[in-house]
Amino acid sequence: MAPKGSERTVKKVVAENRKARFNYEIVDTYEAGLVLTGTEVKSLREGKANIAESYATDEGGEIWLINSYLPEYLQANRFNHETRRRRKLLLSRREVNRLQGAVNREGMSLIPLRIYFNERGRAKLELALGKGKKLHDKRETSKERDWNRQKNRLLKERG
């Protein structure tokens, strides 16, 4: 048996929102469970989900994931799910209150970053609390990224 300090968390990433870190300044991240049907889980295990255009919102004291795309599971005939239905996110009451306060008072957004399966095989969503970037901030980010690439190339050539 391995010592406790050396345990690694194995996460099988199913879908990732790659533009989120470019369009938003991420302040904090949360791990939320997803309420899914059986065919949605099987579709996720095939790895064909898309959360690039999705967002999360709070309604009635609950957090919902809206506009996420989980394709239909081909082997399920009439018991299939809707591809773009609203999905409830499972968070503790304290986390829900904290997120609602940040969204309502500070004008922040709830951005889904990625869907993955944790080490127990449960589907989880990494949810971020962030502020939208302005155009000049996006330009600054891309300039910084380009400079880091050039710097790494130069260091690689010399050493």
Curated annotation (Swiss-Prot):
GO MF annotations in UniProt: RNA binding
Record-level GO BP terms: trans-translation
Sequence ranges of Basic and acidic residues compositional bias: 137-159
Assigned GO CC terms: cytosol
Cellular compartment(s): Cytoplasm
Keyword set, alphabetical order: Cytoplasm, RNA-binding
Main location: cytoplasm
Keyword Translocase in annotation: no
Region annotation Disordered: where it falls in the sequence: 133-159
UniProt-listed InterPro entries: SmpB, SsrA-bd_prot, SsrA-bd_prot_CS
Family that this chain belongs to: Belongs to the SmpB family.
Record function comment: Required for rescue of stalled ribosomes mediated by trans-translation. Binds to transfer-messenger RNA (tmRNA), required for stable association of tmRNA with ribosomes. tmRNA and SmpB together mimic tRNA shape, replacing the anticodon stem-loop with SmpB. tmRNA is encoded by the ssrA gene; the 2 termini fold to resemble tRNA(Ala) and it encodes a 'tag peptide', a short internal open reading frame. During trans-translation Ala-aminoacylated tmRNA acts like a tRNA, entering the A-site of stalled ribosomes, displacing the stalled mRNA.
NCBIfam families reported in the protein's UniProt record: PRK05422.1 (NF003843), smpB (TIGR00086)
Protein name listed in UniProt: SsrA-binding protein
Organism field: Sinorhizobium medicae (strain WSM419) (Ensifer medicae)
Gene for this chain: smpB
